[in-house]
């Protein structure tokens, strides 16, 4: 199985942003009962106007996180872009007879939330100046 996730920063700390991006990307594999194996980084970062050390911290946070879970970084791609974005394409393995999907949900199933509902909406509102932290 393969998945791709990348997004703009949702926290101010570059290292934490890298960690969150890595977890968000490999979580898609875990959510379907798979095992993440390899990842490729995708980053959009401006060539001018932003300290390159910030990208280094983003990458360090992401790499330490994927390594923690046994995922091997095998490559990636970067794009010169005004808006910083970061994430991973993750390849995993899964038993085709044990794939967990949203379509299999039933009334009475237990839902496990890993963050508060509405976090993404609030984060977007803060970025657009429509909400405060």
How does the language model describe each region?
Residues 1-133:
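Helix-biased detector of long, well-ordered alpha-helical tracts
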């Amino acid at each position: 199985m393969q998945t791709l996730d990348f997004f703009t920063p949702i926290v101010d700390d570059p290292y934490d942003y890298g960690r969150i991006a890595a977890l968000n990307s490999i979580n898609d594999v875990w959510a379907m009962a798979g095992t993440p194996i390899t990842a490729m980084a995708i980053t959009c970062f401006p060539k001018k106007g932003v300290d390159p050390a910030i990208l280094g911290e983003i990458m360090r946070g992401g790499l330490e996180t994927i390594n923690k879970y046994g995922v091997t970084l095998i490559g990636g791609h970067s794009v010169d872009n005004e808006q910083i974005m970061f994430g991973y394409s993750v390849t995993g393995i899964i038993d085709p007879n044990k794939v967990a999907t949203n379509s299999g949900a039933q009334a009475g199933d237990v839902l496990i939330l890993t963050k508060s509902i509405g976090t993404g909406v609030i984060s977007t509102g803060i970025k657009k100046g429509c909400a405060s932290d």
